[in-house]
Amino acid sequence: MAASDAHNNNKKRSNRRRKKRRTEDFSSSSESSSSSSSESDHEDLDEPEKEISKQDINIDDIDIESDNENSALTNDKGNKLIPQNLSITEKQQLSTVPFTTTSISNITNDNQIKNTPNINEISKNLDQKKTQLNNEFLKIMTTEFGDDLDELRKKPDFTEKSLVILAKTLQSGVNMFDIDVLNGLIQESGNTSNQ
């Protein structure tokens, strides 16, 4: 019984491969639509298996560096790659050479940011501004969706917890805008409500 199942599975597999080959190669007229299994058909079926196994090669497994490249470089304690053929004094001189900096790297230098004397005050002001913008955005959203919120309050399963969840959900929408866009939205809604 197991032998006949294996034979049927092989037959199904060969039919699938034959159909797949037909769709891939439109110009091939040597294959027929009959389901006869001959040795030539069996030999043709082995070729796609070889192709698939070649396609299954993982790119990460391929070594792209040659032995010559690996031996020419060494990994120093400071994670600096230094050629091996340099003398000790040349290596020391190389390690003392500072990295080049651009105006952007000078602006974004972490050490300068950390050494800013009033960094705590600046971050506190930013947090206050963010909280203020969040509250203003929540006011806009409750105004926009006021009718919908009233309808929800009338539902029997609406609780105080539901109100908190809705408010937090509406307020979290502020995160999809950057500060300039958010300021524009708040100013625009302030102008329309005053008119």
UniProtKB/Swiss-Prot annotation:
Compositional bias ranges of the Low complexity kind: 27-38
Domain of life: Eukaryota
GO biological process: ribosomal large subunit assembly
The keyword Transmembrane helix is assigned to this record: no
Location in or out of the cell: Nucleus, Nucleolus
GO cellular component terms listed in the entry, alphabetical order: nucleolus; preribosome, large subunit precursor
Annotated region (Disordered), positions in chain: 1-61
Principal subcellular localisation of the protein: nucleus
PANTHER family (alphabetical): RIBOSOME ASSEMBLY PROTEIN 3 (PTHR28127:SF1)
Name the record gives this protein: Ribosome assembly protein 3
Organism: Candida albicans (strain SC5314 / ATCC MYA-2876) (Yeast)
Lineage start: Eukaryota, Fungi, Dikarya, Ascomycota, Saccharomycotina
Name of encoding gene: RSA3
